[in-house]
């Protein structure tokens, strides 16, 4: 066995070396104590240096946000599982504000308001982060709305057009098709995405606030089937989430979208819906004992939405020329758009599309009320071809609605009024559109051209949609150059209009109504020339489909 020898000199040298390299390293850490907790809110004692909107760390890695800074305590919103937060637990400062990871890794994913994936497809690889509370672009950092954002919905693109960088409110009662309008708009961006041109591509962010889980799953499935998830991110705060998550969700979606906007890209963001967002913020404010105002909402509920929607903008060329277009949704009760939250958001946005229950129940879908709907800045972004054909559409429909109510009481009408009623009925039928079937703008121009130029006046109302579909199919198959010219030039020249009129008139000769009649009035038959004698001519008419 080896003998153990201890050298006093070695021990002395080790101690001297340790003392020479010793440095006092003190850490200052503020620790608070939970004095009460419940309903997603916690009051914390201590932490005298905490800042508003600062992240706090509760036991178990649960995060909270400091909202109320009182003299002796802090009111914090707990983000996540608040059931395990108890009185007496310690709370630490983080010195950070809320931020989320951002980047192209989010495309095609479903995340929660903290930016964490919840679709079971693994982690999201990102390198950048962005704070949730950021100042909106200033006046000098913006430019006017000039590029169209096509929704693929005839009634919107023709009457209340939307431009890139605009905020267009979609408002209406529950079950009137608000979400369907936004989903169709996202689906319509697929053609632009497939071009691969960054100037045409539009990335989409769908923020679901307080929606049922089945509704969010249905939207995701629709987008996947339409090939739209390749360029879409879903931020989900379902009804089962705490009020804190519902309050944060729109800001998370905006942070993800703003990253792309400042990178020179174009983004469409949908907030579905801001009524539930305001209600979640009201719940938080009341639990924090903030003084209630009108309808028990806190005094800063206007600022809650204005600072969110002001982030939507068309940036100046110096900042890359990116854009963020916002489609906030608001749910009304009994079509009352003069309530507190609806009037707030109407005053913030650049226009609104009002969806009406009565129209929806009559089968007019999308159920857009032309009289109340307006787009304040989108007209500058509308393509010239659509401006030319849809110029009188809004007036015609407004006159039709007015005459329709009058005609219910009048026994006889003059010829002009009858003509307006007949054309109005056909225009209403023309603007109907099935869900999840957005239409390219060049096809919309041709369809609206049929109605406003009087080509449908001889077509029975029940045959209008079939006439439109068969004509568009005819143009696609034999006169594709019409669509190509409208798509590329974005104009309807006199020559093109004449060509289109000739195509429509020729098509009408072979179209049969459901009752088997022609839509072309009979003309006086001229005498047959000698050259045509003993010659055969065959005319093919496409029969109307049999009624089931």
Swiss-Prot record:
Any single Gene Ontology cellular-component annotation: plasma membrane
Record carries keyword Membrane: yes
Location in the cell: Cell membrane
EC number of this enzyme: 7.1.2.2
Membrane-related topology note: Peripheral membrane protein
Binding residues annotated for ATP, in chain numbering: 172-179
Transport among keywords: yes
Catalytic activity: ATP + H2O + 4 H(+)(in) = ADP + phosphate + 5 H(+)(out)
Site entry: Required for activity: 373
GO molecular function: ADP binding; ATP binding; proton-transporting ATP synthase activity, rotational mechanism
Keyword entries, A-Z: ATP synthesis, ATP-binding, Cell membrane, CF(1), Hydrogen ion transport, Ion transport, Membrane, Nucleotide-binding, Translocase, Transport
Disordered: annotated span: 511-548
Biased composition (Acidic residues): 523-534
InterPro entries: ATP_synth_asu-like_sf, ATP_synth_asu_C, ATP_synth_asu_C_sf, ATP_synth_F1_a_nt-bd_dom, ATP_synth_F1_asu, ATPase_a/bsu_AS, ATPase_F1/V1/A1_a/bsu_N, ATPase_F1/V1/A1_a/bsu_N_sf
NCBIfam families noted in UniProt: atpA, PRK13343.1
Subunit structure: F-type ATPases have 2 components, CF(1) - the catalytic core - and CF(0) - the membrane proton channel. CF(1) has five subunits: alpha(3), beta(3), gamma(1), delta(1), epsilon(1). CF(0) has three main subunits: a(1), b(2) and c(9-12). The alpha and beta chains form an alternating ring which encloses part of the gamma chain. CF(1) is attached to CF(0) by a central stalk formed by the gamma and epsilon chains, while a peripheral stalk is formed by the delta and b chains.
Protein family membership: Belongs to the ATPase alpha/beta chains family.
Function of the molecule: Produces ATP from ADP in the presence of a proton gradient across the membrane. The alpha chain is a regulatory subunit.
Name of this chain's protein: ATP synthase subunit alpha
Organism: Mycobacterium sp. (strain KMS)
Lineage, opening ranks: Bacteria, Bacillati, Actinomycetota, Actinomycetes, Mycobacteriales
Protein's gene: atpA
């Amino acid at each position: 066995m080896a003998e153990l020898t201890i050298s006093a000199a070695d021990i002395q040298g080790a101690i001297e070396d340790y003392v020479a390299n010793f440095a006092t390293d003190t850490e200052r850490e503020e620790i608070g104590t939970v004095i009460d907790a419940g309903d997603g809110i916690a009051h914390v004692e201590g932490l005298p240096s905490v800042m508003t909107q600062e992240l706090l760390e509760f036991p178990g890695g649960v995060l909270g946000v400091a909202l109320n800074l009182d003299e002796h305590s802090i009111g914090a919103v707990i983000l996540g599982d608040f059931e395990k937060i108890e009185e007496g637990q310690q709370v630490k400062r983080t010195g950070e504000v809320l931020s989320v990871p951002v980047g192209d890794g989010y495309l095609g994913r479903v995340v929660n308001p903290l930016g964490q994936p919840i679709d079971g497809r693994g982690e999201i690889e990102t390198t950048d982060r962005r704070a949730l509370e950021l100042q909106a672009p200033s006046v000098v950092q913006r430019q006017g709305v000039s590029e169209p954002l096509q929704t693929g919905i005839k009634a919107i693109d023709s009457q209340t057009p939307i431009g890139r960088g605009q905020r267009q409110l979609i408002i209406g009662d529950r079950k009137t098709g608000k979400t369907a309008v936004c989903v169709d708009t996202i689906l319509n961006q697929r053609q632009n995405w497939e071009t691969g041109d960054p100037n045409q591509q539009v990335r989409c962010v769908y923020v679901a606030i307080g929606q049922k889980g089945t509704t969010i799953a249905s939207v995701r499935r629709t987008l996947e089937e339409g090939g739209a998830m390749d360029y879409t991110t879903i931020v989900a705060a379902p009804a089962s989430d705490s009020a804190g998550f519902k309050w944060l969700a729109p800001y998370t979606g905006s942070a993800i979208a703003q990253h792309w906007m400042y990178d020179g890209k174009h983004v469409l963001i949908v907030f579905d819906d801001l009524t539930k967002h305001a209600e979640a913020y009201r719940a938080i404010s009341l639990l924090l004992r903030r003084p209630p105002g009108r309808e028990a909402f806190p005094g800063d509920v206007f600022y809650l939405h204005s600072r969110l929607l002001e982030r939507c903008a068309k940036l100046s060329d110096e900042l890359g020329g990116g854009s963020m277009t916002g489609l906030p949704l608001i749910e009304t009760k009994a079509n009352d758009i003069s309530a507190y939250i609806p009037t707030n958001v109407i005053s913030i946005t650049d226009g609104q599309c009002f969806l009406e229950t009565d129209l929806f129940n009559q089968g007019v879908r999308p159920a857009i009320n032309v009289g109340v709907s307006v787009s304040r800045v989108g007209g500058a972004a509308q393509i010239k071809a659509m401006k030319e054909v849809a110029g009188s559409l809004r007036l015609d429909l407004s006159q039709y609605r007015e005459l329709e109510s009058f005609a219910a009481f009048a026994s006889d009408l003059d010829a002009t009024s009858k003509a307006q009623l007949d054309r109005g009925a056909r225009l209403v039928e023309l603007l109907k559109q099935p869900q999840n079937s957005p239409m390219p703008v060049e096809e919309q121009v041709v369809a609206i051209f049929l109605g406003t130029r009087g080509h449908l006046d001889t077509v029975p109302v029940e045959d209008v949609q079939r006439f439109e579909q068969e004509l568009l199919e005819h143009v696609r198959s034999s006169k594709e150059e019409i669509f190509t010219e409208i798509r590329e030039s974005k104009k309807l020249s006199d020559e093109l209009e004449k060509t289109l009129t000739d195509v429509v008139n020729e098509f009408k000769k072979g179209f049969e109504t459901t009752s088997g009649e022609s839509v072309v009035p009979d003309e006086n038959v001229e005498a047959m020339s000698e050259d045509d004698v003993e010659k055969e001519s065959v005319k093919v008419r496409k029969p109307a489909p049999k009624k089931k």
